[in-house]
């Protein structure tokens, strides 16, 4: 009876809670981080690429990540933390604090030949931190569009950029090959993709493994930093994205893993862990560590085709199942209260929350001029371990995505249909519609666990799960709890009406690197 009453209250609140643009726009200011004074900390944000939920040592001892494990053990592990299922949308939400339904990036990644990028009208986290007095530097993978120079990192608030503009490249040659699947003849396009600010430098670093190269660059930034102002360093790893490449000595100790892809992948993870350790050591050597906040996150679930693993979660990269969006993440810093160190945080946290949390809560900057979907949770996060209840936590809901894209029309539909791929989380309830991606539970090759494949009717359109009782999405309650399903479908409809149209333009042949001195570059001035 008690369970029925609780559920009824949840459904009632879902039905009665009306959404308003004003509320959405004011969220960042809704929870203020208390207190002024104190030195503004340096912020180092590590973003791993395609790292699965089961691909870090503290989730899976088969993965060797001693540096990450040590940092997480001394910090706050975020165990109810969500990102997006593919690269560009997560990066977009990180730098803007906005859902992809509000930026037009609902459908996919930004492909190399698309005249598209994160909206240049949106203030970025780098711009707001620069306003707050920070030096801002980006190293590694951008993947937020580059067809115009206005889309590039140094035009979006970063003082410097060293890295790649596209979504993938050879780790040694720094060349990206392939145009776009729907552009005939572009499959053999190839060009350098390594930039030092605006200059192409790929040919200067032939044979240098990119994880090592990016690490050295971040170390140099730290050593050369003017410590009279705080530092924001955004280090976006290329690893562990395909192609699966790493110096052999990194995977030599994983000979017991029979699956070759998984074995090399484990070596790539080990190399990334070493990089985090080296950069952290440089912060300490430079006398900056005691005033640094370090954040580690992945951008989406592990790619099941290329060695990644999300066990025991369902699905993987590209899907809205938990394996595609529930992320590895933690915060570590000597600045954390002792009571917060070594804690596990289980309140709902989304990648959009980093923007207001870091800009307003940590840097004491302003959110004026932003239109964000994230929450400033810095004050509450620091209370981790001191009985921080979910009642105090501002985030109760995540709109994972609504993708109404149709190749026939760019117009925004006037109503929600269950044929749209979508997912929404409210409290412990999660509803999904029209999921075509892998919904299996794929066991790690190094374990004795068994993969479970689920075959469902292609006509099935709605799933509902209570993640408190069923975190691995095994028991669909969509029919049994049709009251909850209906309430969440209505909410998706309301969010759809607040969305912007999907922006997914056709590819452009002017992107061909052969037209740009053998490099991927802007092609519209």
State what each model feature region is.
Residues 2-463, 471-506, 513-525:
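Formylglycine-dependent sulfatase
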């Amino acid at each position: 009876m008690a369970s029925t009453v609780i559920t009824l209250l949840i459904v009632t609140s879902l039905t009665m809670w009306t959404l308003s643009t004003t509320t959405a726009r004011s969220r960042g200011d809704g929870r203020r981080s208390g207190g002024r004074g104190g030195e503004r900390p340096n912020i180092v944000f590590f973003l791993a690429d395609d790292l699965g939920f089961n691909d870090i040592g503290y989730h899976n001892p088969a993965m060797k990540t001693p540096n990450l494990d040590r940092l997480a053990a001394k910090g706050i592990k975020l165990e109810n933390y969500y990102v997006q299922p593919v690269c560009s949308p997560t990066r977009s939400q990180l730098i803007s604090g906005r859902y992809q339904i509000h930026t037009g990036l609902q459908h996919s990644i930004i492909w190399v030949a698309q005249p598209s990028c994160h909206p240049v009208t949106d203030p970025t986290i780098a711009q707001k931190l620069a306003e707050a007095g920070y030096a801002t530097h980006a190293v590694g993978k951008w993947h937020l569009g580059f067809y115009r120079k206005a889309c590039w990192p140094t035009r979006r608030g970063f003082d410097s950029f060293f890295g790649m503009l596209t979504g993938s490249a050879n780790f040694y040659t720094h060349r990206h090959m392939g145009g776009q699947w729907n552009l005939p003849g572009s499959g053999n396009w190839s060009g350098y993709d390594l930039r030092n600010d605006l200059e192409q430098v790929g040919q200067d670093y032939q044979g240098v493994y990119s994880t090592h190269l990016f690490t050295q660059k971040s170390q140099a930034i730290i050593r050369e930093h003017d410590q009279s102002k705080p530092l924001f360093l955004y280090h976006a790893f290329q690893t562990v994205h395909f192609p699966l490449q790493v110096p052999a000595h990194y995977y030599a100790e994983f000979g017991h893993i029979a699956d070759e892809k998984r074995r090399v992948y484990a070596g790539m993870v080990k190399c990334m862990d070493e990089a985090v350790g080296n950069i952290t050591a440089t912060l300490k050597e430079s006398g900056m560590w005691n005033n640094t906040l370090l954040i580690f996150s992945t951008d989406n679930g592990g790619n099941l085709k290329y060695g990644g693993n999300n066990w025991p979660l369902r699905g993987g990269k590209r899907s809205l199942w938990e394996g595609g969006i529930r992320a590895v993440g933690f915060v570590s810093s000597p600045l954390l209260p002792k009571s917060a160190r070594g804690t596990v945080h289980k309140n709902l946290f989304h990648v959009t929350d980093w923007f207001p949390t870091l800009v307003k809560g940590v840097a004491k900057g302003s959110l004026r001029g932003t239109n964000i979907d994230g929450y400033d949770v810095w004050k509450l996060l620091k209370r981790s371990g001191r009985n921080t209840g979910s009642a105090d936590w501002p985030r109760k809901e995540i709109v994972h995505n609504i993708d109404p894209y149709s190749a026939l029309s760019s117009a925004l539909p006037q109503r929600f249909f269950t044929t749209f791929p979508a997912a929404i989380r409210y409290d412990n309830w999660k509803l999904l519609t029209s999921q075509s991606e892998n919904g299996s539970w794929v066991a790690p090759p190094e374990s004795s666990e068994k993969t479970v494949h689920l075959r469902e009717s292609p006509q099935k359109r709605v799933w509902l799960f209570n993640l408190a009782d069923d975190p691995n999405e095994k028991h669909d309650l969509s029919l049994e709890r049709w009251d909850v399903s209906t309430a969440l479908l209505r909410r998706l409809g309301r969010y759809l009406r607040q969305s912007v149209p999907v922006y997914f333009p056709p590819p452009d042949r002017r992107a061909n690197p052969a037209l740009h001195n053998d490099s991927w570059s802007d092609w519209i001035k």
